[in-house]
Amino acid sequence: MSILLLNPIKWNDYALLDSGEGKKLERFGPYLFSRPEPQAFWSKRLPNEVWSKVAGTFLPSSSLDDNETSGKWLIKSNVLDRWEMSYDNIKFFSTPTPFRHLGFFPDQSPHWDWAAKKITNFIYNSNTETPPKILNLFGYSGLASLHAASNGASVTHIDASKKAINFAFENRDL
C-alpha cells in the first residue's frame, strides 16, 4: 500500500521552512513564526540563528506560569496585527490567534485545489448553466469557500462562531 502525499503547490506567501524539536518554522507573508508541533520529534535542520529571526513565537498554555486556558503569542513590535496574503486567485488576511494558528490552515490547500478541479470539471462537462453548489460547514475564515467560489461554485459558508463569520466576510471583501 502506498501513501498519497499531498503538497501545497500554489503558495507564494507561505512556506514551511523547517521543523524539529517539537516546533515548526514557517513564513507567513513577510514574517517568520515558530509554532509548537508535537509530532516534529527529529532535530531541526536550519541553524538557530535562522530560528532566532522569528517575528512571533507561540507559547502553549502548558508552558505558561499563569492559569490561561489558551496559549499566547510573543510578537515583536514591528509585526502588524493582520496582513494581507494570497493563495492562487484569492486574497485574505492572516493574524495570530490564541489557538496557535494564524487565521487559516495552509496544509488544507491541496483540498481546496482538489475541490477546484472537481468544480471546473463539473462546469466543463455539465449541460446546465447552474453552477455546482458547495456547502462548507465549519468554514472558519472562508478560504476554502472563497477558493471554491472563485472557481465557479455557488457556496454556502457556515460556521458557528460569529467571529469566524466576520473574519470570512472581511476576507471576501478584499
Model-derived regions: residue spans:
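Compositionally biased amphipathic helical and low-complexity segments enriched in hydrophobic
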Residues: 5-6, 75, 123, 147
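Single, functionally critical "micro-switch" positions that shape active/binding sites
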Residues: 28-29, 137
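Non-catalytic substrate-recognition/targeting regions of SAM-dependent transferases
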Residues: 11-26, 33-106, 113
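Conserved SAM/SAH cofactor-binding pocket of Class I
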Residues: 117-174
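Short, Gly/Pro- and small/polar-rich lid/capping loops
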Residues: 1-15
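Generic preference for flexible, low-structure residues
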Residues: 32, 41-44, 48-50, 108-110, ...
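Short, contiguous clusters of charged residues that form electrostatic/catalytic patches at enzyme active sites
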Residues: 106-113, 117, 166
